[in-house]
């Protein structure tokens, strides 16, 4: 199974870090984005984004992930299901072309890759502490004020684009930019693009989203 980032972290941690970064609303390969212009009213966007995320207590969706490798013309496509529930509970389950499970419950992480299982505490890893904070900020609507990123916001008729350029060393060593597309109807994330320093990029699209769905706590149990 291909691992997303070829850098300084052990393989399981590489995948977990990318997954958690999806909740940071979890952004840019170009200086400008075709079809987008700089947001007209930044204060209004931040206020409405914060209000919408505060009302969102859970998210359930399908996802499609595309991994584009700079050394290969072929892209790697994966599919699965995603769940989020306040406070700080995430379950991401890959079903195609391989089975992979990640559960994040506050400061505890559980990973199952085939028959291999691994448990990790975010308290023991500074990068993970930073990522965990980003996730919480996003769910609370305060991610746009995170000093660990330089932020720019663009918009078109139907969506907003948030470009995050990492400033903190841990994130700078992993990513050049992270781009999040937000639906203007409900301010939910429709896609995330992560551009690595190597030139590789990962795009994750969220489909069939259900906001404030009834999700049992048992889905996030870390034994």
Regions found by a protein language model. Give the residues of each.
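Short hydrophobic/aromatic-rich beta-strand segments that constitute the beta-sheet cores
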Residues: 63, 90-94, 109-112, 162-164, ...
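Amphipathic hydrophobic-ligand
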Residues: 74-81, 104, 200
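An acidic-aromatic
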Residues: 81-129
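Positively charged n-region of N-terminal signal peptides that target proteins for export
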Residues: 2-3, 11-16
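Short, solvent-exposed helix-to-loop capping segments enriched in aromatics
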Residues: 53, 130-143
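Sec-dependent N-terminal signal peptides
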Residues: 8, 16-25
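Gly/Pro-enriched, hydrophobic low-complexity segments
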Residues: 120, 144-223
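N-terminal leader/targeting segments and the immediate start of mature chains
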Residues: 30-64, 68-73, 218-223
């Amino acid at each position: 199974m291909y691992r997303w980032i070829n850098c300084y972290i052990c393989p399981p941690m590489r995948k977990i870090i990318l997954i958690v970064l999806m909740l940071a609303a979890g952004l840019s390969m170009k200086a400008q984005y075709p079809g987008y212009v700089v947001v007209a009213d930044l204060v209004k966007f931040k206020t409405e984004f914060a209000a919408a995320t505060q009302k969102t207590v859970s998210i359930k969706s399908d996802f499609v992930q595309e991994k584009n490798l700079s050394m290969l013309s072929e892209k790697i496509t994966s599919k699965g299901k995603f769940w989020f529930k306040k406070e700080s509970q995430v379950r991401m389950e890959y079903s195609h072309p391989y089975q992979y499970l990640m559960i994040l419950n506050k400061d505890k992480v559980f990973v199952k890759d085939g028959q291999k299982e691994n448990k990790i505490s975010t308290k023991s890893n500074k990068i993970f502490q930073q990522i965990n904070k980003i996730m919480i900020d996003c769910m609370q609507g305060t991610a746009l004020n995170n000093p660990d990123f330089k932020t720019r916001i663009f918009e078109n008729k139907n969506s907003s684009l948030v470009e995050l350029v990492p400033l903190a060393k841990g994130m700078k060593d992993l990513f050049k930019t992270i781009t999040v597309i937000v639906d203007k109807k409900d301010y939910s994330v429709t896609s995330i693009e992560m551009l690595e320093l190597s030139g590789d990029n990962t795009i994750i699209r969220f489909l069939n989203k259900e906001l404030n769905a009834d999700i049992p706590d048992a889905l996030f149990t870390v034994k």
